[in-house]
Structure formats: C-alpha cells, structure tokens
C-alpha cells in the first residue's frame, strides 16, 4: 500500500483566503489611485453622463466662458480615470485568482511528487527483499544439489528439514511475488493517476499561459489607452489654451469696437453740432439774401431815379447843376461797385461752405463704409470661430464615442476572462472531487484484493490438504523447479514495471472456483494477477507429496493469513 496523499486545503478555507486577498488588493489599488490622482473623487461612477457646458452659461455676445470648456474636458478625464480604475481592479482580481490557482497547482504537484517518491522507495525495498530471498533460495538449491549421505532415521531427516525450509521459502516467495504484483498494480494505478493529473496540470498550465498572454495583451492595451488618453489630454489642454487666446483676442476686439463706437458717437455728436451750425449759417445766408434783394430793389429804384434825372438833365442841358449831378452819378457808380464786390465775396463764401459740406459728406460716407466693413469682418470672424467650435465639439464627441467603445470592449474581455476563471475554478473543484472519489475507489479495490488473497490462500490450503501424497524425491524435484521458475518470474516482475491496469471485477470473479467442475491439480486461478497454473506452474502451489508436505502447506497458509493480517494492520496504520 502507498501512503495516504496530502490533499489541498478545504475549498471554503481557500475561498476565504482568496476573498481576503482580493479585499487587500482592492484597498491597495484604491490607495494607489488616490495617490496618483488626488483630484478624482473615490466614489465616481463609471456610468455617469459626461455633459458639456449648459446653454445658460453663454455670454451676451454669444461666446462661452473658458470655464465651460474646461469643465467638459475635466469631466472626460474623470470618466476615463473611473473606467481605468474598474479595469485595474478587475485585473488585480484576476491576478489574485491566478496566484491562488498556481498555489493549489503547486500543492498538487508536491503531493504527486511525494506519492511517486514513496512508491519508488517501497518498490526499491521490495526488490531488495526479493533479491535477498533469491540469494537464500540459491544457497538452498546448492545445498540440496549436493549428495546426501544416508543417516539412520533417528529423527527428522535433513531432507525433510530442507523440504520444510523450501516449502516455507516457496510460500514466502509466493507471498512476496503477490505483494510485488500488488505493488506493481498499485504503481500502475498511481502512474495512470499521475499521468491524468499531469495532463490536467498541463492543460491548466496552458490555460494559465493563455490567460497570462491575454492579461499581457490587456495590459498593453491599457498602456496604449493610457498613452492615448494622455495625448488627448495634452491636445485638449492645447485646444483650451488656443480657445483662451481666441477669447482674449475677441475680448480685445470687443474693447476696441467699444472704443470705436464711443468715438463714432462723439463724431456723430460733433456732426450734429456742425449740422446745427450749418443750419444757423443757412438761416443767416437766407437773411443776407433777403437783404441783398432789398438792396437790389433799392438800386433799381435809384437807377430809375438816375434815369429820370438824366432825362431831366438832358432836358436841362445847360443847367449849372450838371457838375453836381455828375458827382452824384459817380457816387452811385461807386456804391454799385462796392455792392458787386460784396456780392462776389458772399458768393465765394457760399461756394466754400458748399465745398466744405460736400467734403464733410464724403468723410461721413467713408466712415460709414469703414464701419460697415469692420462689422462685416467681425461677423466673418465670428462665423469662423463658430465653425471651429463646432468642429472641435464634433471631434470631442467622436473621440468620446470611440473611447467609450474601447472601454466597453475591454470590459467585455475582462468579463470573459472572469467567466473563464470561474469555469476553471469549477473544473478544479470537480477534479479534486474526482481525485477523492478515485482514491476512495482504489481503497475499496485494495480491500477487495486483500479479501481475495485471503480466500485464495484458504482455497490453496484446502486443496493442498486434499491432494494425494507422492514420493519425497518427486516433491523435491518439483520444488527445485518451482524455485527456479520463481526466480525467473521475480526477474520478469522486476523488468515489467508498466503492465496493464488490472480489473477488479474480473479478479473477484476469477478468485472463486468454478462450480460443478472437477478441480484439477493446482487449477485455482489468481484473480489479482490474472494468470493460471498452466501459464505459471511455479506459482501454482502444487501440493503433491506426503501428508507432511500437506501439513507444511497448511502451516504456510497460516503464515500467509498472518502476513495478510499484519499487512492489513500496516495499511490501517499508514
């Protein structure tokens, strides 16, 4: 019998230890992420919606404040950090589960190695015992081969003593051969179990390797995603800086426009004042024109008077008052000249005023055109900025959707890995249950084999008691032959260590004698090894001899019963 294997600890205890390890790993992960990103809250949820700036935060000019864009960007960072926390926690759980499974596998391999070592040591011990017995048999064979001198039959002869010793040794050899055969069968069963366990361990190692490769791939993907997120954060920071610069420029432009509007208002006020002055001047000019008309009327009247005077002078050609009239005429002409000069000056002033008005109108038109051009340029700038903002928002939305898709794919992969890990743990539990059932079945088979051996020994003793006595010489020859055959079979048993697995049901059936058939000489069959006396006559237990030989066979059967009982005790102790 092989020693009892050391089984792994109870599954409930292993589950408790795994849960403790998982809780410790989660705490360490939370502390690590809090150290790495202190601005992120601990209770952030992965499924929170990432909303942008609200429409209520718009300014009077249609521009958003720089704080609105910053809130949306930092919201993205928080959501990505929460998803990374979930992925890292799931990865740590998988790593802890892999560590626990590797520990269980190492314990099982240690148990298997210890079983193999103990079986090898027992096999070596049995081979050593068989070699000792073979040497003693060889010595006895040499002693029996020497010619014996006839002695008086004072007591039991040397031949009978040697015969008894050979019988006893033969029985011991048979028992040792059976023990060796049982050990070989047990070793075969153990080798089969070891092979199955090695195959399962190889499969588990392959699964673990595949899972490790998948975990490595996931780690690479996580690192790539972290790099992408960092690049995106850098891009978003650059975009924020650009937006801030744009907003600063727009603020400066708005201030300039406000200053220009104030200047335009001042200019408009000045223009209003100038228009009022021009209206006053027009009124004055109208008054002057009326005065000039009155003067012209007066001049016309004076001309008529002068004509009348000339006519009178013509009538009074030689009047003494001609000189006086000429002087008056000269005075009137002088007055007319002065009036004409005044009229010319007034006309010049009026023309100058009209020219100034035209120039002022041209200036006003130019200023209005400039203002319109500025307004048009500002509208175009606003349109371009609005287009840039829309494009940036679309790019951000597309990037968010892509990141969410990647995170969902990673979560699906992690769930698949967790499902595989759960199935693997179930397989391990089933495998442990199967190993326990197989060990219990092997113990039952071992008990049945012990009972079969005891029955075989009983049948052999009965058959030897019923056998007919023969001459002692033939018995010695048969015993010598049987010892030689036993040595050969022991050598064959040493060489053949990898025989086929025995069948317990067939052995139980073969251990019983056939009902209704005559039992020939040594016709009982050993169900444990599956051989007959015709195939192996050395181990057939021939009981041909005198009554003393039959008695020796009975004593050998009693010894075998005692050895079986001692073996049972050894099994129970182990």
From Swiss-Prot:
Stored InterPro entries: GOLGA6L, GOLGA_cons_dom
Annotated Basic and acidic residues bias: 491-504
Compositionally biased intervals (Pro residues): 1-11
Domain of life (superkingdom): Eukaryota
Keywords from the UniProt entry: Coiled coil
Stretches that traverse the bilayer: none
Residue ranges, compositional bias (Low complexity): 508-523
Coiled-coil annotated spans: 157-496
Cysteine-cysteine disulfides: none
Skewed-composition ranges (Polar residues): 51-62
Region Disordered, residue ranges: 1-77, 491-552
Family, per entry: Belongs to the GOLGA6 family.
Protein name: Golgin subfamily A member 6-like protein 4
Organism from which the protein derives: Homo sapiens
Record gene name: GOLGA6L4
């Amino acid at each position: 019998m092989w020693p009892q294997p050391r089984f792994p600890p109870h599954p409930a205890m292993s589950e408790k230890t795994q849960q403790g390890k998982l809780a410790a790993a989660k705490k360490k992960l939370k502390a690590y992420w809090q150290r790495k990103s202190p601005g992120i809250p601990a209770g952030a949820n992965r499924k929170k919606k990432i909303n942008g700036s609200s429409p209520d935060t718009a300014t009077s000019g249609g521009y958003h404040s720089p704080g609105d864009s910053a809130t949306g960007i930092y919201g993205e960072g928080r959501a990505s950090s929460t998803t990374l926390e979930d992925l890292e926690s799931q990865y740590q759980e998988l790593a802890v589960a892999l560590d626990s499974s590797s520990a269980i596998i190492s314990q099982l391999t240690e148990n298997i190695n210890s079983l193999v070592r103990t079986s090898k040591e027992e096999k070596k011990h049995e081979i050593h015992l068989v070699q000792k017995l073979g040497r003693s048999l060889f010595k006895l064979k040499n002693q029996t081969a020497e010619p014996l001198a006839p002695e008086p039959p004072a007591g039991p002869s040397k031949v009978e003593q040697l015969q008894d010793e050979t019988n006893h040794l033969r029985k011991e050899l048979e028992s040792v051969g059976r023990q060796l055969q049982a050990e070989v069968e047990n070793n075969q069963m153990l080798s089969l179990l070891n092979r199955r366990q090695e195959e399962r361990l190889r499969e588990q190692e392959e699964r673990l390797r595949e899972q490790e490769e998948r975990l490595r791939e996931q780690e690479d993907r996580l690192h790539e995603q972290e790099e992408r997120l960092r690049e995106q954060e850098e891009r978003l920071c650059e975009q924020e800086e650009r937006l801030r610069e744009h907003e600063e420029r727009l603020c400066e432009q708005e201030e300039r426009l406000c200053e220009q509007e104030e200047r335009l208002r001042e200019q408009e006020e000045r223009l209003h004042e100038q228009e009022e002055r021009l209206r006053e001047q027009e009124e004055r000019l109208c008054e002057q024109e009326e005065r000039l008309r009155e003067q012209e009327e007066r001049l016309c009247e004076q001309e008529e008077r002068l004509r009348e005077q000339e006519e009178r002078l013509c009538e009074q050609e030689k009047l003494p008052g001609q000189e006086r009239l000429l002087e008056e005429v000269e005075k009137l002409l002088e007055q007319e000249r002065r009036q004409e000069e005044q009229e010319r000056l007034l006309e010049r002033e009026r023309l100058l005023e009209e020219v100034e008005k035209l120039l002022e109108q041209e200036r006003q038109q130019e200023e209005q055109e400039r203002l319109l051009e500025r307004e048009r340029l500002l509208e175009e700038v606003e349109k371009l900025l609005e287009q840039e903002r829309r494009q940036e928002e679309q790019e951000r939305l597309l990037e968010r959707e892509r990141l969410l898709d990647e995170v969902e794919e990673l979560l699906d992969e992690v769930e698949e890995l967790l499902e595989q890990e759960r199935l693997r743990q179930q397989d391990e539990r089933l495998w442990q249950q199967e190993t326990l059932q197989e060990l219990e079945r092997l113990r039952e088979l071992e008990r049945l084999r012990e009972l079969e051996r005891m029955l075989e020994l009983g049948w052999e003793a009965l058959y030897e008691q019923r056998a007919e006595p023969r001459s002692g010489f033939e018995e010695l020859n048969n015993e010598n032959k049987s010892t030689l055959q036993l040595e050969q079979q022991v050598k064959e048993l040493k060489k053949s260590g990898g025989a086929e697995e025995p069948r317990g049901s067939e052995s139980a059936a073969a251990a019983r004698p056939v009902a209704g058939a005559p039992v020939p000489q040594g016709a009982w069959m050993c169900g444990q090894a599956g051989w007959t006396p015709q195939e192996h006559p050395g181990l057939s237990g021939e009981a041909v001899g005198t009554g003393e030989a039959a008695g020796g066979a009975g004593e050998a059967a009693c010894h075998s019963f005692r050895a079986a009982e001692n073996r049972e005790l050894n099994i129970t102790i182990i």
